[in-house]
Amino acid sequence: MKEPIQYHNQEELNKFLEKGVIIPEPQSVKIERSINLPQIGKGTFLHPFSRIEGEQSYIDESCEIGIAGAVTILNSGVGKGSRLGTLGPVTIKDTFT
């Protein structure tokens, strides 16, 4: 059976905030523990219900994730200045294959 995904806790999320990642509602954002500080760029805005999973995932600087709806980044990269939003849930998955 696959192990459940482990997410950063509030104290760990604070390190992303200190680095310049903008998370207005940290209790609603999930970042997998395999994601390290350098993998999410300064000035990136993570809207409520954003999820970042997969150890290969990264988000460059000045991105906006989860505009108008839930977005999941799964083993994928998001380029500098990208804006991801939706009218419903979106998953971006395995963009490196």
Short names for language-model regions:
Residues 1-97:
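Domain-scale signature associated with acetyltransferase and cell-envelope carbohydrate enzymes
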